[in-house]
Each structure stands twice: as C-alpha cells, then as structure tokens.
Regions:
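Serine-hydrolase catalytic machinery in alpha/beta-hydrolase-like enzymes
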Residues: 65-73, 77, 82-168, 178-181, ...
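Acidic, glycine-rich loop-and-strand cores that form catalytic or ligand-binding grooves
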Residues: 231-263
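Sec-dependent signal peptide recognition
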Residues: 2-10
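A domain-start/cap signature at the N-terminus of enzymes
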Residues: 16-86, 112, 141, 170-193, ...
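Short beta-strand/loop motif that positions the catalytic acidic residue
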Residues: 215-217, 221
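Catalytic active-site module of serine/aspartate enzymes centered on a nucleophile-bearing elbow/loop
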Residues: 299-315
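Conserved alpha/beta-hydrolase "acid-adjacent" motif
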Residues: 222-234
C-alpha cells in the first residue's frame, strides 16, 4: 500500500463532526463524519494537518477557546475490527503537546503495544503560558478542562473504535495534576499516571468509581516538592488518599536496583488487594528533581514504559 493511499485512509479515519474535512493542504475535500453525530454534537472537530500515515493534528472550539490535540494510531490500525485502549498525554505548565510527544516516546510504545495516544494542548494564561485548570492554579479557573475531556472522550468513543474500559490519562507536572483531577471527576477514566504532579489540598476529589494510580516523583523536586506544601499533597499523601479511597488491604515497599550506579535508589510503594482490583503505586526517586524519568537519560526507571505496563494490566 503506497504512502499516499495510507494518508488518504488516515484522513477518513480522522474524519470529524462537520460538513467539511480540512486536508493537510487546507483544501476543502467535502465528506465528513457519517456516524452517530448526535453523540459529538458539542465538539466540532476539524482536521488541521496530517503528519504521516499514523499521526494528525486537530482543533475543536470548546467554551471560549479553540482546543488542539495530536492523535497517533498504531500501524495497521483498523477501526472496523480493533477496539483499542486510549491514552491521553498532558504536558506541563508552559510546555506544549508536541514537546511531550517528543520526549515521552509514547508514539513508539503505541506502535509496539497497539493503543491510541492523544497529546492534548492546554490553554494559555494572560502571560501566554500554557496550562490546565487542575483545580489548584488560579490562572486557568475559567477554563472547563474537565468538560472538554468529557466531550473529547465522547468524540473518540464515537469516531474511533475505543475499548471503553481502557481510557487513561497521564501527564508531566501540571499535566499530572490535571490527570489527577480527571481521576477525581471523570468516570470514564480507568486509571491515571502522574510524573512530578500531585493533588491540590483545596481541590475536592469525590470520584464515583475506583481508580488505579501510578505516580513518579523525585525526592529533590523543587518545582512541585515531593513533601508537598500548604496547597498541595505530598507524593505520599496522594498515595494515601487513593489507598484509602480504593480500600486497599495490603502495602509493600521495595527498593529497585541502582542501574546507573550513582548510589541513589528508587523506592516503589505499592498498595494492593484493593476494591475492584485496583492498585496504587508510588515511585520515589532519591536525588532526582523535576523531570520525566527515562533510562535513556541516566535514570533508574523509565516512566513511559512503566506507565503503559501499569495501564495495560488494569481491568
């Protein structure tokens, strides 16, 4: 199958709830999404650009903002006979969706493990910095990010063939905070992963369903302190919250091998025997700061691979 034909198929796969599809060149190609449009009538998605035969970017007006996201599907994705997991990946404060796409490596994991990954772009504050209404940051309180993700999930359920029991979110820093908020407020989210992001003390969290949580945090993080503060939970407090909420019966802590030989270790705390087969994990990285952890960059663990393995194991 030649590349042009693959791209043509991609455009069809990435069709949207509007009367026109915008192609890579911006030309009007006609057509449009022909399925159950009523389910996505609150989110009018337009194709912006086709990157390659597996990846494209989209925009959708929502509230007072135009929202953007990048979708990557695995090779040979066929919506007619494949029901795949869906993973949202959220950037940190001041960052961008293309940046976390580059450093997290989820495209490659998606190709190998067969799931759909979506890199969502936050909105901007008055200083032009991107971020999320994670409930703890005043600059974004007017943005209905929770509502947007609910609509985005509805869109993917309708346009793509999604395994509705396997919808996940992960993020870096403020993207981790936002993933925690989605765990608290969006029932469709099965589990979340956070890298250097925690929970706000003054953000209500009353989930209606049990959620599995995996959290990575450097003990020397000076941006989002490992030990928390007046307005945010420590990494251990966030773990304790979900351990209690999930009614976990057992807990074990192990020290992982010092793979890079720097004399500093990663401790893995696991709460298990929880209700609904949920699990809560905390990786505490001795001597590490505010970053996305990867063995390729000299860390003892690789966040992305462990997050996906954790998601894959969830029921």
């Amino acid at each position: 199958m030649n590349k042009i034909y693959k791209i043509l198929i991609l455009v069809i796969l990435f069709s949207c709830n509007s009367k026109n599809i915008l192609t890579d060149t911006g030309e009007d190609s006609g057509g449009g999404f022909t399925g159950e449009v009523g389910y996505i009538q609150d989110l009018n998605v337009e194709l912006i650009s086709v990157y390659d035969s597996q990846t494209a970017s989209f925009s959708a007006p929502f509230g007072n903002f135009v929202r953007n996201f990048i979708v990557h599907v695995p090779p040979d994705y066929n919506s007619e006979n494949q029901s795949l997991p869906l993973v949202f990946v959220l950037h940190g404060y001041t960052s961008q969706a293309p940046i976390i796409r580059q450093y997290s490596g989820f495209d490659q994991i998606s190709n190998e493990e067969n799931f759909i990954v979506v890199y969502v772009q936050g909105t901007t504050d008055i200083y032009g910095n991107t971020g999320w209404n994670a409930g703890s940051f005043g600059a974004f309180t007017t943005v209905d990010d929770v509502g947007f993700f609910r609509s985005l999930i509805k869109y993917f359920k309708t346009v793509y063939n999604i395994n509705e029991k396997k919808i996940f979110s992960t993020g870096m820093s403020m993207g981790g905070f936002m993933s925690y908020r989605l765990a608290c407020e969006v029932d469709d989210i099965n589990s979340i992963g956070s890298v250097t992001g925690s929970m706000g003390r003054y953000t209500p969290c009353q989930p209606q369903t049990k959620k599995s949580i995996i959290h990575f945090h450097g003990e020397e993080d000076t941006i989002v302190p490992y030990n928390g503060g007046d307005w945010l939970y420590s990494a251990n407090e966030a773990h304790e919250f979900w351990k209690n909420y999930n009614e976990c019966g057992n807990q074990v802590s192990i020290t992982l091998p010092d793979l890079n030989g720097d004399g500093q270790y990663t401790k893995k705390l696991t709460s298990y025997n929880c209700e609904d087969s949920k699990i809560v994990e905390l990786y505490s990285l001795e001597g590490e700061g505010h970053t996305w952890y990867s063995k390729n960059w000299g860390h003892d663990v690789s966040s992305s691979e462990l997050i996906w393995k954790f998601f894959e194991d969830q029921q």
